[in-house]
């Protein structure tokens, strides 16, 4: 089982994750696209990496915006799994 990161570890990791912020016990970022199709294409791109990691984000889609929230539910907070998936998702948003 993954271990929760300390507040200092989270802060240090967020320095390398532009646009991501800590909101309570999760990481969050809202990505903006040209239109709804861009939003859905982004969501479709993140499905395979999330499945491969066995770690699934909470998503909110609103026309040209997708808000991604990451937390490790079984430990009740942010773990390295969240940081790693945030990096992958950030790379997927650049098209």
UniProtKB/Swiss-Prot annotation:
It catalyses: (4aS,6R)-4a-hydroxy-L-erythro-5,6,7,8-tetrahydrobiopterin = (6R)-L-erythro-6,7-dihydrobiopterin + H2O. Its EC number is 4.2.1.96. The keyword Lyase applies. The keyword Cell membrane does not apply. One of its GO terms (molecular function) is 4-alpha-hydroxytetrahydrobiopterin dehydratase activity. InterPro entries: PCD_sf (IPR036428), Pterin_deHydtase (IPR001533). It comes from the Bacteria. Gene3D superfamilies: Transcriptional coactivator/pterin dehydratase. It is an enzyme of class 4 (lyase). Keywords: Lyase. It holds the Pfam family Pterin_4a. GO terms for biological process: tetrahydrobiopterin biosynthetic process. CDD domains: PCD_DCoH (cd00488). Belongs to the pterin-4-alpha-carbinolamine dehydratase family. PANTHER family: PTERIN-4-ALPHA-CARBINOLAMINE DEHYDRATASE. HAMAP family: Pterin_4_alpha. This is Putative pterin-4-alpha-carbinolamine dehydratase. It comes from Thermosynechococcus vestitus (strain NIES-2133 / IAM M-273 / BP-1).
């Amino acid at each position: 089982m993954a271990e929760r990161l300390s507040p200092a570890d989270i802060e240090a990791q967020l320095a390398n994750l532009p646009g991501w912020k800590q909101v309570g016990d999760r990481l969050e970022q809202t990505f903006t696209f040209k239109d709804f199709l861009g939003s859905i294409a982004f969501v479709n791109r993140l499905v395979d990496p999330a499945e491969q990691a066995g770690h699934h984000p909470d998503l909110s889609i609103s026309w040209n915006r997708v808000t991604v929230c990451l937390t490790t539910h079984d430990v009740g907070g942010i773990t390295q799994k969240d940081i790693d998936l945030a990096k992958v998702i950030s790379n997927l948003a650049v098209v």
